[in-house]
Amino acid sequence: MGDEEKRKMEEKERKKAEVRKRLEEAAKAKKAGGKRGFMTPERKKKLRNLLRKKAAEELKKEQERKAEQRRKIIAERIGQPKPLDNCNEATLVGILKQYHARIAQLEDAKYDLEYEVRQKDFVINELTIQVNDLRGKFVKPALKKVSKFDKLKMVVKSTSEVDFRSSLKSVKKDAFKLDEENKADKKPEWALGSKKENEE
């Protein structure tokens, strides 16, 4: 243990000396070069390249991991292929029935999952509407996009069709009738009275 501790101490001292030496060199360079920033353009370029390489490697690893995971899941779900080479007709029919049952089961599960997703989407939509109502924010309807050329065509079309009657105020025809005409249309009270008596 004594030798090992000595070796560790020497290693620490050596590292400290290296760090001290680097700091001294940096201080000398700073004094000699005036005010130069730590990140010189070359260092920035190197750092950028290193970051790009690292990001590309991580992306590649992630893609490989996802592809491997996908292969495992597919192999697990599909299972081993059935030997079809030396099979008679009865075994082939049995294998086909197994595959058919498996497909039906998977379609059933798929339908259930799709139904569940639709239900949850509906619930999410309802909850968002409630939240917006509570906040006082309302869903703005999507506006129909109209190009400026279509808009101009519509304006030109509306101005080209001149309709003078559309600008006139509409008037009720009954306002200008005389009261006498209204009275002439009405039946006398004695005629109405006899009808009322008959109804009773």
Curated annotation (Swiss-Prot):
Keywords: Coiled coil. Signal peptide: none annotated. Residues 2-116 form a coiled coil. Residues 1-20, 181-200 are annotated as: Disordered. Transmembrane segments: none annotated. It holds the Pfam family Troponin. InterPro entries: Troponin, Troponin_I, Troponin_sf. GO terms for cellular component: troponin complex. GO terms for biological process: modulation of process of another organism; muscle contraction. Expressed in salivary gland, gut, muscle and cuticle (at protein level). It comes from the Eukaryota. Belongs to the troponin I family. Rabbits immunized against the protein show higher resistance to tick infestation; feeding on immunized animals results in longer feeding duration for larval and adult ticks, lower engorgement rates for larval ticks and reduction in egg weights for adult ticks. PANTHER family: TROPONIN I. Inhibits endothelial cell proliferation and angiogenesis in a vertebrate host. Probably required for efficient blood feeding on vertebrate hosts. This is Troponin I-like protein. It comes from Haemaphysalis longicornis.
